Amino acid sequence: MSVRKILRMGDPILRKISEPVTEDEIQTKEFKKLIRDMFDTMRHAEGVGLAAPQIGILKQIVVVGSEDNERYPGTPDVPERIILNPVITPLTKDTSGFWEGCLSVPGMRGYVERPNQIRMQWMDEKGNQFDETIDGYKAIVYQHECDHLQGILYVDRLKDTKLFGFNETLDSSHNVLD
């Protein structure tokens, strides 16, 4: 198990745009180790997803996967998946709001609205191409993680900064994490 350091909001790397992953890169031992490290880091931090920029790697790589996550009680499981070079297209103007947190913004949450349904095109770690329509909680998770690849944090998407704060304060004043 190799857990990497997660960068925090304020680190300039988190604000940079990531480069696509090439099919040659996915064949390397270094790439395979990076993917293992990303999953180890995500699980250790009890995250639902992790993007490569969060550990200082400016590549378009996201890993997701979560069952019974204590940080987000009552949310559906997210199957493990490796997402490379994603392209997201909103399929509706309808949005849903969710109290989002981030491993790079520890101890805080903010209410973010995102498109309910998206189309996501991506490549997996074997070079297979995918094109899928995604909705619900999974769509929120994928959009949040893929934002990292463009140098965007969820705090950039807050419409109302009064709906942003520390977990403990929000727990007692808004009952959002019951």
Curated annotation (Swiss-Prot):
GO biological process per UniProt: co-translational protein modification; translation
Chain sites annotated for binding Fe cation: 102, 144, 148
Domain of life of the organism encoding this protein: Bacteria
Root EC class: hydrolase
Catalytic activity: N-terminal N-formyl-L-methionyl-[peptide] + H2O = N-terminal L-methionyl-[peptide] + formate
EC number(s) on file: 3.5.1.88
Binding note for cofactor: Binds 1 Fe(2+) ion.
UniProt xrefs under Pfam families: Pep_deformylase
Entry annotation: catalytic residues: 145
Alphabetic keyword roster: Hydrolase, Iron, Metal-binding, Protein biosynthesis
SUPFAM superfamilies: Peptide deformylase (SSF56420)
UniProt cofactor(s): Fe(2+)
Database matches in InterPro entries: Peptide_deformylase, Peptide_deformylase_sf
Molecular function terms from GO: metal ion binding; peptide deformylase activity
Function: Removes the formyl group from the N-terminal Met of newly synthesized proteins. Requires at least a dipeptide for an efficient rate of reaction. N-terminal L-methionine is a prerequisite for activity but the enzyme has broad specificity at other positions.
Subunit comment: Homodimer.
NCBIfam families assigned: pept_deformyl (TIGR00079), PRK00150.1-3 (NF001159)
Family: Belongs to the polypeptide deformylase family.
Protein name: Peptide deformylase
Protein source organism: Leptospira interrogans serogroup Icterohaemorrhagiae serovar Lai (strain 56601)
